[in-house]
């Protein structure tokens, strides 16, 4: 069971892949715990009913070591065309992949003792991941970790003006 999990409403999923953008070596993170930057691709945007079709992460240890992993997941349900159009993953691509239940214990072990981070992760990725753990019957404690939503940081750091948008685009 997932304990003390912060639920959020009205998720919005943004296409984002962290694996293609590793941390710069000159970037110094002062980490107490390892942090896992992760992204999910899913069958849709409903936290309660949609399923993971891909999980990828970059795990950064306090000593600076990094490890990455990408897994395709059979969601055991049809992937709607609209979702496939976003992430490019179709039913045939995951037909022979393991289900989340089959990999849940390994994923839980990979993120054990880690803080979690991602883009829009507090509103979408973390709730979806928690729901998948619940369905798989894997107990994971979400109370002893920090959640870092890069989207929140981005919105605080970037100017939200017409002039800034003009310069950006």
Regions of interest found by a model, annotated:
Residues 1-8, 26:
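Positively charged N-terminal leader segments that act as targeting/secretion signals
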Residues 13-15, 151, 159:
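Residue-identity detector for glutamine
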Residues 5, 11-22:
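Arg/Gly-rich low-complexity intrinsically disordered repeat tracts
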Residues 24-144, 159-169:
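Conserved non-catalytic scaffold segment of RNase H-like nuclease domains
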Residues 3-4, 17, 29, 148:
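Intrinsic-disorder/low-complexity regions
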């Amino acid at each position: 069971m997932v304990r003390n999990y912060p639920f959020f409403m009205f998720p919005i999923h943004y296409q984002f892949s962290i694996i293609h953008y590793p941390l710069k070596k000159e970037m110094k993170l002062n980490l107490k715990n390892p942090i896992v930057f992760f992204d999910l691709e899913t069958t849709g945007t409903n936290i309660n009913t949609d399923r993971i079709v891909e999980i990828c992460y970059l795990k950064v240890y306090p000593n600076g070591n990094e490890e990455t992993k990408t897994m395709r997941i059979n969601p055991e349900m049809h992937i709607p065309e609209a979702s496939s159009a976003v992430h490019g993953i179709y039913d045939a691509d995951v037909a022979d992949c393991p289900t989340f239940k089959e990999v849940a214990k390994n994923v839980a072990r990979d993120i054990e003792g880690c803080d979690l981070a991602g883009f829009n992760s507090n509103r979408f990725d973390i709730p979806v991941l928690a729901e998948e753990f619940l369905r798989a019957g894997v107990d994971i404690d979400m109370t002893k970790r920090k959640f870092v939503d890069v989207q929140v940081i981005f919105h605080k750091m970037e100017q939200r003006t017409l002039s800034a948008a003009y310069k950006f685009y």
